[in-house]
Amino acid sequence: MNLHEYQAKELLAGYGLPVQGGILARNGEEAAAAYDKLGGKFAVVKAQVHAGGRGKAGGVKVVKSREEAKEVAESLIGTNLVTYQTDANGQPVNSVLVCEDMYPVQTELYLGAVVDRSTRRITFMASTEGGVEIEKVAAETPEKIFKVTVDPLVGLQPCQAREVAFQLGLKDKQINEFVKLMTGAYKAFVDNDFALFEVNPLAVRENGALACVDGKIGIDSNALYRLPKIAELRDKSQENERELKASEFDLNYVALEGNIGCMVNGAGLAMATMDIIKLKGGQPANFLDVGGGATKDRVVEAFKLILEDKSVKGVLINIFGGIVRCDMIAEAIVAAVKEINVNVPVVVRLEGNNAELGAKILNESGLKLTSADGLNDAAEKIVAAVNA
């Protein structure tokens, strides 16, 4: 689950991080009032969406008057912002954050943290190249990224934070200020089950003080049951409608941009299925894992979910019967096809527990379902059917 910038800054401020001042506005009048309250010669109006690249997409603008703040806010709110991190439809802008002007600054830094799956530990990343996409820095000048891995048994140590401060070129009081900032960020990360933390840029102001100009936080959705206050911050308008519906039925769904719908049980098998579709010249329209304990109702809902995507021209169902029985899946497929008006080819590959019985159910259903012998055969058949 992602947080908006204003939510991230409020959370981080609670842990002692110095953040750029800002006021949330949901319409033009509120934006104008926010400009007046900030009291500076300039202000920055930022569209609040769950996506990066807002500046280049016109979602971050400097304003010099209350009238301009109102005008910019009204031009953004109610529209969809398309960035390099969104799909072609973009993300809806329901509010803007009117921020204090902090520029010019001495320099812009970067500070971020993720859960490194290879070390199974929280890893901080810092760089002197703030204000640009960290992916670009990693690709072009990886030597400018400093990493610190935190031992979960002892937590982030002050000496680790000081070492990062030295590498960033900070001096004197800035070092202690940065240690406090990084320590607070680590505590926030652990307390709230972050999956991602990023401040870009972390500005060094003209007076030498540090300030978080932006804030990005991703929460581990598996931990929301124990984070009720964080869960209340969820903005469902920023989520893919089908992905949101899938979560209600405990389905793991990710929308893609292809035309072959996929229904698979098991994340590994789902990824392998998408790979072989690509290998055979097709384009998967989604990642959909119905899970090892899939029920008939969940399979029916999964089928509906796939077919709600109007770009889908065919469906490949790939089931390995382990915990789940292939005959139960077959019955669910038949029920779904009968319930929904399916006008696209459907290829089914069943393997494992009761696979023969499942194939028999499909063959005797009288429906236009194509059986496949093996994953290779299934991919070839669905790609051929879609391209026919």
From Swiss-Prot:
Mg(2+) binds at N200, D214. Its EC number is 6.2.1.5. InterPro entries: ATP-grasp (IPR011761), ATP-grasp_succ-CoA_synth-type (IPR013650), ATP_grasp_subdomain_1 (IPR013815), Succ-CoA_synthase_bsu_CS (IPR017866), SUCC_ACL_C (IPR005811), Succ_CoA_ligase-like_bsu (IPR005809), Succinyl-CoA_synth-like (IPR016102). The keyword rRNA processing does not apply. GO terms for molecular function: ATP binding; magnesium ion binding; succinate-CoA ligase (ADP-forming) activity; succinate-CoA ligase (GDP-forming) activity. One of its GO terms (cellular component) is succinate-CoA ligase complex. It holds the Pfam family Ligase_CoA. Keywords: ATP-binding, Ligase, Magnesium, Metal-binding, Nucleotide-binding, Tricarboxylic acid cycle. Substrate binds at N265, G322, I323, V324. Binds 1 Mg(2+) ion per subunit. Pathway: Carbohydrate metabolism; tricarboxylic acid cycle; succinate from succinyl-CoA (ligase route): step 1/1. GO terms for biological process: succinyl-CoA metabolic process; tricarboxylic acid cycle. ATP binds at K46, G53, R54, G55, E100, Y103, E108. The keyword Isomerase does not apply. Its cofactor is Mg(2+). Residues 9-245 form the ATP-grasp domain. It catalyses: succinate + ATP + CoA = succinyl-CoA + ADP + phosphate; GTP + succinate + CoA = succinyl-CoA + GDP + phosphate. Succinyl-CoA synthetase functions in the citric acid cycle (TCA), coupling the hydrolysis of succinyl-CoA to the synthesis of either ATP or GTP and thus represents the only step of substrate-level phosphorylation in the TCA. The beta subunit provides nucleotide specificity of the enzyme and binds the substrate succinate, while the binding sites for coenzyme A and phosphate are found in the alpha subunit. Belongs to the succinate/malate CoA ligase beta subunit family. Heterotetramer of two alpha and two beta subunits. This is Succinate--CoA ligase [ADP-forming] subunit beta.
